C-alpha cells in the first residue's frame, strides 16, 4: 500500500507554507512521499472562490490524495523530527483525527478558550490539522459528512449551541463528523504523541496572537527552539511569514 503526507494549500501564503512544511518533512524523513494539493488539483474545483480562507475545500482531500494511507497536515506547520513510526501505530485504523495539542513547553494543553463551541455542544475535541485516513468506507463516509456540514451549515447551526454568526470551521466540521460516526471509529485519544504545538496566544501566554513578536526563537537546520526549548512535536506556527525562516534554515 502507498502512503504519504498530503498538504492542502490554496492561495500564495498557504502554498509557501506548504513548501516549507514539505521541506521540513523531507529533511527528517528523506524517503517520505509528500503531495501538496493546490487549487488546480481539487477534484471538484474551488468551493470558496471568493474567500481567502478555503476551509470549504478540505473535504476534497479524501479523493485528492494519491495514497492508500494519508496523513493530512495543515500547511502552516513544521515537522521537527521523524514521525514515520506513526504509520505503524495508525495502520490498523481507517481514520484517526488528532485530539491533543501542546504549548511551546511541549506540555499537553488544557486551555479551552478556543474550544467553546466544542464544549457547549459536547463534541469530540477534534483537531483537523493532523488527520490520518485510509482509503476506506469509513474515511469516505467521514468526508461526506464534513462536506455536508459545510454545505448545510445553517441547518446544522440551528440544532447547535452557538453564536448566530458562528461560521463553519474545519475543526467544527470534523468534530461533528466524529460525533456522528463515533469517537471509537474516528479518534485515538490514547495516542497523545499524535499532537501539535499550537502557537495560539492564550495557549502560550503571549500578549498577542503574533508570538514571534514576544518570544525568542531560533530556526536551525535540525531544530526550532522557542524560548530556548527545542520543539519535538509538529509545530503549528500559524504566523504565515514564519515559513520564510523555516525555508532559510533548511537550505
Predicted regions and their residues:
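Short, charged, surface-exposed secondary-structure boundary motifs
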Residues: 19, 44-47, 104-110
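A glycosyltransferase accessory/donor-loop signature
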Residues: 39, 120-130, 137-251
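Active-site-proximal specificity loops/subdomain of glycosyltransferases
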Residues: 36-65
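Conserved catalytic core of nucleotide-sugar-dependent glycosyltransferases
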Residues: 88-149
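N-proximal low-complexity "stem/linker" segments adjacent to membrane-targeting elements
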Residues: 1-16
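Short amphipathic alpha-helix
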Residues: 20-25, 57
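GT-A fold catalytic core of metal-dependent nucleotide-sugar glycosyltransferases
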Residues: 54-108
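Short, acidic, metal-binding catalytic loop of nucleotide-sugar glycosyltransferases
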Residues: 24-32
